[in-house]
Amino acid sequence: MTVTKKTTKKTAPKKTSKKTAPKKTTKKTAPKKTTKKTAPKKTTKSLRTKVICISHKEDNDGISSAALIRQAFGGDAILVDYPGQMEALYQVVTDEKLKSLFICDLGLSKKTQDEFIDILTTLRKNKVSVTYIDHHDIDPNVVKALQKIKVKVIHDVNECTTVQVYNTYKSKLNDHASFVATCAAITDYMEDRPIGSKLLQMYDRQFALISATVLTYNIVGRQREPDYLLYLVEELSESKFPHDIPNTFEFAQIQVEKLSQIIAKVKKGLKTMSKLGHMEILDSGASGAVNFVMGLSGKDVGVAYKERVDHGIYAVSVRGSANCKVHLGRIVNPLATSLGGSGGGHDKACGAVVPKAKIKKFITELNKKIK
């Protein structure tokens, strides 16, 4: 009997069953795994779903443009200054999920325009929908080149970018979007233009002015806080008034106090040439000080410049008074480019990026070109 037991153990059918278990064979040839590996349709669909808006981060027009694009189309915003403009475009051109790209309130210079066209050409070859919305002075040949590759160009120097976004896509926007556009027009000094003026008439003027001003101080004062700027885009896209966004008025008051201190510093540090006043700014943004430089110098043109140590350049703001007879943007664009930088903008308000070693020459040459 003992022998029988041993024999039984050796030939136990259970062990044989485990070796030839059909379940294991089924797992190896499971069609589900094969389906996952070869399912191209699901992968292809997920590639082209993303909407991105690249917009100017330094003023209300850029932030508000991004907010209205977000309200109309959803998606994400990438906020940049001019030195970071091309870097952002290179970032999105490799994004295989990108479906639609909006570029707002970012003017082009002679230095950047060819590169801009090349990048957008690549995007269009990848079947990405591209819309460029702006109001800065632009070379007509650039517009033709963009239209040739089927980029949708919305461009009018007579209205700020947000107003153009609103006017183009208002069927996709809610009623509050008109107020966002109104505030942007005010802060870009374009509330007297055909569409901008009609929008302003819809609201109490003082209410719109204080809202636009508070928004501007929060944007200018938080340039080193990218998450906050994106938060503002979200809040504005959700139809929040500036006074509904926590601490905006309190922060604006702090910025006003700082600006009042700049007046005394400008009086002490500003320099003049025959046609312009200029000053290097050390402890605030150049754009916030440039109007004081112009006004206190008694000249029709003011230039404020601040070093960007991380880029080895100066960020330059240029402003002209009502008496300024030249188009500053058209002078600054080729001048900055000839010195290895870039620039451009409007007739009485523009900016430039100039290599650190060339800032003195930039100011001297600009002074010569002002009639």
What are these regions (language model features)?
Residues 48-93:
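Anionic-ligand anchoring segments at beta-strand to alpha-helix junctions in alpha/beta enzyme folds, i.e.
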Residues 95-116:
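Short, structured active-site "lid" loops
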Residues 4-45:
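Intrinsically disordered, polybasic Lys/Arg-rich low-complexity tracts
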Residues 48-52, 59-60, 70, 137, ...:
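A structured phosphate/pyrophosphate-recognition subdomain
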Residues 115-127, 145-148:
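Catalytic-core regions built around general acid/base machinery
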Residues 52-53, 68-73, 77-80, 102, ...:
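Catalytic phosphate/metal-binding cores of nucleic-acid and nucleotide-processing enzymes, i.e., regions
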Residues 63-65, 97, 277-371:
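Glycine-rich, acidic loop segments that terminate in or are immediately followed by a histidine
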Residues 50-52, 99-102, 129-131:
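Structural motif
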